[in-house]
């Protein structure tokens, strides 16, 4: 008899069986039912304050990241009714650039952990994460290893995430699915 582990039990207890069309229909229904009550400036302000300004292009340079950061610096205080964006998100090698250029009260986020596919050595993921945090990252976005997940190697996947989280120290770690 096959015994389910805690991950299999959790997935079994929370099945997701909607098609893409059903998800789209449900989202459209939620928007239709709630649009009027949320179509006001306070909602827009909240949404703006949740945004991460992100640059994850293969052509990114220190100069480009510096200029992008400067635009956020220039916006700070320009409209006292609107809070800053949540963060500037970059590749880990640009965290130091953002940290040096940033004067606005905005967090620094980065992708790490073998982004986008998580297909590298655990030691590389840990080192990349630790260096990014040391250079000023407040948040680190880590992709799950989809191969481990699909192969139902949940324990190994979670162990990896736990070790990477340890490398984050006080920085927030956000686990992401890279689907694009």
Predicted features along the sequence, with ranges:
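Alpha-helix-loop-beta-strand connector modules within alpha/beta enzyme cores
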Residues: 92-114, 152-179
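Active-site mouth loops of central-metabolism enzymes
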Residues: 34, 50-62, 109-126, 147-153, ...
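Short, surface-exposed connector motifs at secondary-structure boundaries
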Residues: 75-84, 171-174
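Active-site cofactor/substrate anionic-group-binding motifs, chiefly glycine-
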Residues: 79-135, 139
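Short, acidic/polar
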Residues: 61-72, 122-132
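Electropositive phosphate-/nucleotide-binding environments in soluble metabolic enzymes
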Residues: 41, 58-66, 92, 126, ...
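Charged, compositionally biased N-terminal leader segments and the immediate start
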Residues: 1-51
